Protein backbone atom coordinates (compact mmCIF):
# COMPACT_ATOMS: atom_id res chain seq x y z
CA UNK A 1 0.00 0.00 0.00
CA UNK A 2 1.33 3.41 -0.97
CA UNK A 3 0.70 7.00 -0.06
CA UNK A 4 -2.54 8.30 1.37
CA UNK A 5 -5.18 9.51 -1.05
CA UNK A 6 -8.33 11.31 0.05
CA UNK A 7 -11.48 10.11 -1.68
CA UNK A 8 -13.60 13.26 -1.85
CA UNK A 9 -16.72 11.47 -0.68
CA UNK A 10 -18.66 10.96 2.52
CA UNK A 11 -19.62 7.44 1.42
CA UNK A 12 -17.25 4.88 3.02
CA UNK A 13 -18.78 2.21 0.78
CA UNK A 14 -16.86 3.66 -2.17
CA UNK A 15 -13.45 2.94 -0.60
CA UNK A 16 -13.13 -0.76 -1.60
CA UNK A 17 -14.15 0.03 -5.20
CA UNK A 18 -11.72 2.95 -5.47
CA UNK A 19 -8.89 0.94 -3.90
CA UNK A 20 -9.49 -1.95 -6.30
CA UNK A 21 -9.72 0.32 -9.34
CA UNK A 22 -6.38 1.88 -8.37
CA UNK A 23 -4.81 -1.58 -7.90
CA UNK A 24 -4.28 -1.03 -4.16
CA UNK A 25 -1.53 1.53 -4.80
CA UNK A 26 -2.94 4.01 -2.27
CA UNK A 27 -4.22 3.99 1.27
CA UNK A 28 -7.69 5.49 0.79
CA UNK A 29 -9.27 7.73 3.41
CA UNK A 30 -12.57 9.53 2.80
CA UNK A 31 -13.29 13.22 3.19
CA UNK A 32 -16.02 12.17 5.62
CA UNK A 33 -13.54 10.28 7.80
CA UNK A 34 -11.40 13.42 7.91
CA UNK A 35 -14.40 15.58 8.82
CA UNK A 36 -14.08 17.69 5.68
CA UNK A 37 -17.19 19.58 4.56
CA UNK A 38 -18.74 18.80 1.19
CA UNK A 39 -18.43 21.67 -1.29
CA UNK A 40 -21.39 22.91 -3.30
CA UNK A 41 -21.22 21.52 -6.83
CA UNK A 42 -21.40 24.81 -8.70
CA UNK A 43 -19.81 23.86 -12.01
CA UNK A 44 -21.75 23.17 -15.22
CA UNK A 45 -19.89 20.00 -16.28
CA UNK A 46 -18.93 16.64 -14.79
CA UNK A 47 -15.24 17.55 -15.21
CA UNK A 48 -15.74 20.91 -13.51
CA UNK A 49 -17.50 19.38 -10.50
CA UNK A 50 -14.93 16.57 -10.13
CA UNK A 51 -12.09 19.09 -10.21
CA UNK A 52 -13.84 21.39 -7.74
CA UNK A 53 -14.35 18.52 -5.25
CA UNK A 54 -10.79 17.19 -5.65
CA UNK A 55 -9.18 20.63 -5.16
CA UNK A 56 -11.43 21.32 -2.15
CA UNK A 57 -10.47 18.05 -0.43
CA UNK A 58 -6.76 18.38 -1.30
CA UNK A 59 -6.47 21.94 -0.08
CA UNK A 60 -8.31 21.25 3.20
CA UNK A 61 -6.58 17.94 3.97
CA UNK A 62 -3.07 18.70 2.74
CA UNK A 63 -3.14 15.36 0.89
CA UNK A 64 -3.73 14.43 -2.74
CA UNK A 65 -7.42 13.91 -3.36
CA UNK A 66 -9.55 12.01 -5.86
CA UNK A 67 -13.07 13.06 -6.77
CA UNK A 68 -15.59 11.90 -9.29
CA UNK A 69 -18.74 13.28 -10.80
CA UNK A 70 -20.90 11.08 -12.93
CA UNK A 71 -24.36 10.77 -14.32
CA UNK A 72 -26.74 9.82 -17.07
CA UNK A 73 -27.35 12.03 -20.10
CA UNK A 74 -30.29 11.42 -22.45
CA UNK A 75 -30.08 12.56 -26.07
CA UNK A 76 -33.80 13.42 -26.45
CA UNK A 77 -33.67 15.44 -23.21
CA UNK A 78 -30.78 17.59 -24.45
CA UNK A 79 -28.37 15.80 -22.12
CA UNK A 80 -30.55 15.89 -18.99
CA UNK A 81 -30.42 14.84 -16.23
CA UNK A 82 -26.65 15.15 -16.74
CA UNK A 83 -24.89 16.80 -13.80
CA UNK A 84 -28.24 16.78 -11.99
CA UNK A 85 -28.60 12.97 -12.15
CA UNK A 86 -28.45 12.47 -8.39
CA UNK A 87 -30.72 15.45 -7.72
CA UNK A 88 -33.43 13.94 -9.92
CA UNK A 89 -33.58 11.18 -7.28
CA UNK A 90 -34.49 13.74 -4.62
CA UNK A 91 -33.09 14.09 -1.11
CA UNK A 92 -33.88 10.44 -0.35
CA UNK A 93 -31.81 9.26 -3.35
CA UNK A 94 -34.87 7.45 -4.72
CA UNK A 95 -33.69 6.33 -8.14
CA UNK A 96 -37.01 4.60 -8.87
CA UNK A 97 -38.43 8.14 -8.78
CA UNK A 98 -35.57 9.43 -10.95
CA UNK A 99 -36.09 6.69 -13.56
CA UNK A 100 -39.82 7.44 -13.63
CA UNK A 101 -39.00 11.12 -14.14
CA UNK A 102 -36.76 10.24 -17.12
CA UNK A 103 -39.53 8.09 -18.60
CA UNK A 104 -42.14 10.83 -18.12
CA UNK A 105 -39.90 13.51 -19.65
CA UNK A 106 -39.24 11.26 -22.66
CA UNK A 107 -42.98 10.70 -23.12
CA UNK A 108 -43.43 14.50 -23.20
CA UNK A 109 -41.04 14.80 -26.15
CA UNK A 110 -42.03 14.03 -29.72
CA UNK A 111 -38.88 11.93 -30.09
CA UNK A 112 -38.55 8.16 -30.28
CA UNK A 113 -34.82 8.51 -29.61
CA UNK A 114 -33.90 6.53 -26.49
CA UNK A 115 -30.13 6.84 -26.79
CA UNK A 116 -28.24 7.91 -23.70
CA UNK A 117 -24.78 7.79 -22.17
CA UNK A 118 -23.17 7.53 -18.78
CA UNK A 119 -20.23 9.81 -18.03
CA UNK A 120 -17.71 9.58 -15.21
CA UNK A 121 -15.22 12.38 -14.68
CA UNK A 122 -12.32 11.76 -12.29
CA UNK A 123 -9.94 14.36 -10.92
CA UNK A 124 -6.87 13.95 -8.74
CA UNK A 125 -5.58 17.18 -7.23
CA UNK A 126 -2.54 17.88 -5.09
CA UNK A 127 -2.69 20.52 -2.32
CA UNK A 128 -2.29 23.97 -3.87
CA UNK A 129 -0.89 22.31 -6.96
CA UNK A 130 -1.55 20.50 -10.21
CA UNK A 131 -4.44 18.22 -11.08
CA UNK A 132 -5.14 15.38 -13.49
CA UNK A 133 -8.63 15.11 -14.98
CA UNK A 134 -10.03 12.31 -17.15
CA UNK A 135 -13.43 11.28 -18.43
CA UNK A 136 -14.98 7.91 -19.29
CA UNK A 137 -18.16 7.37 -21.25
CA UNK A 138 -20.36 4.45 -22.24
CA UNK A 139 -23.15 4.82 -24.80
CA UNK A 140 -26.39 2.89 -24.81
CA UNK A 141 -30.17 2.87 -25.01
CA UNK A 142 -32.85 3.32 -22.37
CA UNK A 143 -35.55 0.70 -21.75
CA UNK A 144 -38.77 0.99 -19.79
CA UNK A 145 -39.74 -0.55 -17.50
CA UNK A 146 -36.36 -1.05 -15.92
CA UNK A 147 -34.90 -4.54 -15.71
CA UNK A 148 -32.68 -6.11 -13.08
CA UNK A 149 -31.85 -5.41 -9.46
CA UNK A 150 -28.06 -5.23 -9.58
CA UNK A 151 -26.03 -2.08 -9.59
CA UNK A 152 -27.47 1.25 -8.52
CA UNK A 153 -28.88 4.50 -9.80
CA UNK A 154 -30.13 4.35 -13.37
CA UNK A 155 -28.59 0.91 -14.09
CA UNK A 156 -31.94 -0.92 -14.57
CA UNK A 157 -32.95 1.28 -17.55
CA UNK A 158 -29.58 1.42 -19.35
CA UNK A 159 -28.55 -1.12 -22.00
CA UNK A 160 -24.94 -0.52 -23.10
CA UNK A 161 -24.27 -0.46 -26.83
CA UNK A 162 -23.72 -3.94 -28.26
CA UNK A 163 -25.42 -5.74 -25.36
CA UNK A 164 -28.91 -7.07 -24.60
CA UNK A 165 -28.86 -6.83 -20.80
CA UNK A 166 -29.25 -3.67 -18.75
CA UNK A 167 -26.51 -2.73 -16.30
CA UNK A 168 -29.05 -3.78 -13.66
CA UNK A 169 -29.18 -7.32 -15.09
CA UNK A 170 -25.44 -7.80 -15.65
CA UNK A 171 -23.09 -9.61 -13.34
CA UNK A 172 -21.09 -6.93 -11.50
CA UNK A 173 -17.81 -8.04 -13.10
CA UNK A 174 -19.31 -7.73 -16.60
CA UNK A 175 -20.64 -4.24 -15.90
CA UNK A 176 -17.42 -3.15 -14.21
CA UNK A 177 -15.38 -4.22 -17.23
CA UNK A 178 -17.20 -1.77 -19.52
CA UNK A 179 -18.65 0.93 -17.29
CA UNK A 180 -17.97 4.64 -17.64
CA UNK A 181 -16.23 4.55 -14.26
CA UNK A 182 -13.92 1.68 -15.29
CA UNK A 183 -13.05 3.53 -18.49
CA UNK A 184 -12.27 6.70 -16.54
CA UNK A 185 -10.12 4.80 -14.02
CA UNK A 186 -8.18 3.13 -16.86
CA UNK A 187 -7.38 6.60 -18.25
CA UNK A 188 -6.50 7.89 -14.79
CA UNK A 189 -4.10 5.01 -14.10
CA UNK A 190 -2.44 5.62 -17.47
CA UNK A 191 -2.06 9.32 -16.64
CA UNK A 192 -0.69 8.68 -13.14
CA UNK A 193 1.44 5.57 -13.55
CA UNK A 194 2.53 5.24 -17.20
From Swiss-Prot:
Its EC number is 3.6.1.66. Keywords: Hydrolase, Magnesium, Metal-binding, Nucleotide metabolism, Nucleotide-binding. GO terms for molecular function: dITP diphosphatase activity; ITP diphosphatase activity; metal ion binding; nucleotide binding; ribonucleoside triphosphate phosphatase activity; XTP diphosphatase activity. GO terms for biological process: nucleotide metabolic process; purine nucleoside triphosphate catabolic process. The active site is at 69 (proton acceptor). Pyrophosphatase that catalyzes the hydrolysis of nucleoside triphosphates to their monophosphate derivatives, with a high preference for the non-canonical purine nucleotides XTP (xanthosine triphosphate), dITP (deoxyinosine triphosphate) and ITP. Seems to function as a house-cleaning enzyme that removes non-canonical purine nucleotides from the nucleotide pool, thus preventing their incorporation into DNA/RNA and avoiding chromosomal lesions. HAMAP family: Non_canon_purine_NTPase. This is dITP/XTP pyrophosphatase. It comes from Caulobacter vibrioides (strain ATCC 19089 / CIP 103742 / CB 15) (Caulobacter crescentus). The lineage of its organism: Bacteria, Pseudomonadati, Pseudomonadota, Alphaproteobacteria, Caulobacterales.
Amino acid sequence: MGAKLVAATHNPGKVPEIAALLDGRFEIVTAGQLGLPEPDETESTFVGNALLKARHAADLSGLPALADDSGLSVTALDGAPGIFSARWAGPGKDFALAMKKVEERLEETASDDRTAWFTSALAVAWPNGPAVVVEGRVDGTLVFPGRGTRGFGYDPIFVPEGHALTFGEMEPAAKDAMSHRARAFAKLKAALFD
